[in-house]
């Protein structure tokens, strides 16, 4: 499955520790590390929520219903998966402390921490602390050997499987089709393409829908919890085109499609870099670098071209406070040197950089850069009693971080 999203190799040569993460939420603990400018007044109430078996979007929806407000008034810095015990921050516009204190949601503990003058944004999140129990993994000797090798070569910062979907890893495929201006096929891949691992009954319905492309049948057969698929099919029944239907999706979901395709190309670039160089510590002409900023916890900040101050950049990489950065390609990306290999990957899909400027803003992207190396030295990593504890800067995936140790596929 990993190869389908561009994760094609390991950087370490050690044997895997093996093991698996069980389905119990307590085995996967994640806590946001964030910085806010709090005050005693402001239009935005800031809350800290400890929740179990709640994904972020569903929690925000249920919370808005409990408060009797629009979900648009609730903001957060990042999304968290359902199958975990999570601590996360939310801002709520125009709600008082007394109102939130009357809310009681199952498996969720809500604590008011203050007010702010603006909503929570992605930039407020520095990173996440993880505590993950792995069942059936081997002893700590392999752990130490792998850790040492990662310190020497770098720790690959792939986008994890969850970037591409929860059970059906098709988000990047939808993004590719949108960039190809093939909205009809993008619509049906999202709504109907069957995928191994999905609920058997639902998969069979999708198989029929994939063959027939019958919106009426889909509305009759697809379960109600697949609300986005059903909403799209309803738009077709109302006479809208596949393109118009896709544009009716929530903004954050629309943006995910092209972002997922960018992530797929990034993963392929990172895999190829590892294969060619065997290390993420080597810098070439035309490369970019990302720098750590040390706040409450370290987080990656600006990127720059290596040649702008080559001696300084090489020194910072050697001192482990800067990382090689690879492009998240977009219409403004300037590819130089080694990274021009991205053009070959795009060409395989009949795309180029200009393809990322579409007629719809939410399906366009100018591009950016992402650190290739997680810099394991700053994670505070420990391993005791089959439990990994570590911190990762925002945008880094715990399952990706662990894969070099376990050498097993983690979704």
UniProtKB/Swiss-Prot annotation:
Protein family: Belongs to the pseudouridine synthase TruD family.
Pfam families membership: TruD (PF01142)
EC annotation from Swiss-Prot or TrEMBL: 5.4.99.27
Keyword annotations of the record: Isomerase, tRNA processing
Naturally occurring in which organism (per UniProt): Archaeoglobus fulgidus (strain ATCC 49558 / DSM 4304 / JCM 9628 / NBRC 100126 / VC-16)
Active site: residue positions: 81 (nucleophile)
HAMAP family in the record: TruD
Gene behind this protein: truD
GO molecular function per UniProt: RNA binding; tRNA pseudouridine(13) synthase activity
Gene3D superfamilies: 1.10.1510.30, 3.30.70.3160, TruD, catalytic domain
Primary enzyme class: isomerase
Gene Ontology biological-process annotations: tRNA pseudouridine synthesis
Domain TRUD: 154-375
Highest taxon of source: Archaea
Catalytic activity: uridine(13) in tRNA = pseudouridine(13) in tRNA
Protein name (Swiss-Prot/TrEMBL): Probable tRNA pseudouridine synthase D
Role: Could be responsible for synthesis of pseudouridine from uracil-13 in transfer RNAs.
């Amino acid at each position: 499955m990993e190869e389908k999203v561009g994760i094609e190799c390991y950087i370490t040569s050690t044997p895997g520790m093996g093991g698996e993460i069980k389905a119990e939420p307590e085995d996967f603990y994640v806590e946001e590390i964030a910085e806010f400018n709090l005050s005693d007044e402001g239009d935005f109430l800031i809350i800290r929520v400890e929740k179990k078996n709640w994904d972020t979007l569903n929690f925000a929806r249920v919370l808005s219903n409990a408060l009797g407000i629009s979900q648009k008034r609730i903001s957060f810095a990042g999304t968290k998966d359902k199958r975990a015990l999570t601590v996360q921050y939310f801002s709520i516009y125009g709600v008082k402390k007394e109102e939130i204190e009357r809310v009681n949601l199952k498996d969720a503990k809500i604590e008011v921490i203050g007010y702010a003058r603006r909503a929570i944004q992605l930039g407020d999140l520095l990173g996440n602390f993880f505590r993950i129990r792995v069942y059936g993994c081997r002893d700590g000797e392999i752990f130490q050997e792998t850790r040492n090798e990662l310190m020497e070569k770098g720790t690959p910062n792939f986008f994890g499987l969850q970037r591409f979907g929860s059970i059906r890893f098709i988000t990047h495929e939808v993004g590719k089709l949108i960039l190809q201006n093939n909205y009809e096929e993008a619509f049906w891949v999202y709504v109907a393409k069957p995928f191994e691992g999905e609920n058997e009954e639902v998969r069979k319905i999708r198989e029929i829908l994939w063959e027939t492309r019958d919106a009426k049948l889909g509305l009759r057969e697809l379960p109600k919890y697949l609300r986005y698929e059903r909403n799209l099919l309803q738009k077709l029944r109302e006479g809208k085109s596949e393109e118009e239907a896709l544009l009716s999706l929530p903004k954050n979901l629309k943006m995910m499609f092209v972002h997922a395709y960018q992530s797929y190309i990034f993963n392929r670039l990172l895999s190829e870099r590892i294969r060619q160089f065997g290390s993420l510590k080597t810098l070439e002409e035309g490369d970019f670098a990302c720098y750590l900023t040390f706040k409450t916890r370290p987080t990656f900040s600006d990127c720059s071209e290596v040649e702008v101050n080559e001696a300084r950049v090489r020194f910072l990489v050697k001192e482990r406070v800067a990382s090689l950065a690879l492009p998240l390609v977009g219409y403004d990306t300037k590819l130089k040197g080694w990274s021009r290999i991205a053009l070959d990957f795009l060409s395989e899909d009949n795309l180029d950089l200009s393809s990322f400027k579409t007629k719809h803003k939410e399906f366009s992207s100018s591009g950016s850069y992402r650190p290739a190396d997680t810099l394991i030295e700053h994670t505070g990593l420990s391993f005791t009693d089959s439990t990994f504890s570590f911190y990762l800067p925002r945008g880094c995936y715990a399952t990706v971080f662990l894969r070099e140790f376990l050498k097993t596929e983690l979704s």
